Amino acid sequence: MHSQLRERIRLMRARLDNARPVIEIPAEFQLFVTPAPVCDRLVTLAEISNRDHILEPSAGTGAILRAIRDTAPGAMCDAVEINSGLVRYLRENFNGVRVQCGDFMEWQPVQYYSRVIMNPPF
């Protein structure tokens, strides 16, 4: 058993050694990344389809956007993110998603959305 655990730890360390941070986030932004299984569940519960136009009002690192893209690659997505560094990351990594930089509470959408998906418990 110990050898299996050691091997798992070694593999995790190897993955982390090759990983690079997306961006350094100052504490005042309060970034809460939703785990991938939770994102998948959110998308399933929201019954996302390729016909939907979806808003993600606090996109962060794009965890929910990734789950949407995996489930319904034809869905149109708009995202709002207050951190300009994360906005750059989202624009570079989520082609086709319209990413707005700003505070969602002050943002004025110009259209209606068929679905809004955000970090729980919101």
Segments and roles (model prediction):
Residues 1-122:
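Class I S-adenosyl-L-methionine-dependent methyltransferase catalytic core
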